[in-house]
Amino acid sequence: MASKMKTRKSAKKRYSFTVNGKVKYKKQNLRHILTKKSSKRKRNLRKSGNLSCFEVKRIKTLLPYG
């Protein structure tokens, strides 16, 4: 009986796949020390980011069942 591939739990918590196969992630720098950051910068950081196609291949190896 073949063993299953393991999912990297750290990648599972950080990335999620869309229906079209793109990878979404939450942007960094929005946890603390927010007073010196402008409202525009904080507003743009609230939006989710998309990875490029080169990085998607690497993430798919970390998340085989994603």
From Swiss-Prot:
Signal peptide feature range: none
InterPro entries according to UniProt: Ribosomal_bL35, Ribosomal_bL35-like, Ribosomal_bL35_CS, Ribosomal_bL35_sf
Pfam family, one: Ribosomal_L35p
GO cellular component, one term: cytosolic large ribosomal subunit
Gene3D superfamilies cross-referenced by the UniProt entry: 4.10.410.60
GO MF annotation, one: structural constituent of ribosome
Superkingdom of source: Bacteria
Keyword annotations from UniProtKB, A to Z: Ribonucleoprotein, Ribosomal protein
GO biological process: translation
PANTHER family: 54S RIBOSOMAL PROTEIN BL35M (PTHR33343), LARGE RIBOSOMAL SUBUNIT PROTEIN BL35M (PTHR33343:SF1)
Family: Belongs to the bacterial ribosomal protein bL35 family.
Protein name as annotated: Large ribosomal subunit protein bL35
Organism: Borrelia garinii subsp. bavariensis (strain ATCC BAA-2496 / DSM 23469 / PBi) (Borreliella bavariensis)
Lineage, broadest ranks: Bacteria, Pseudomonadati, Spirochaetota, Spirochaetia, Spirochaetales
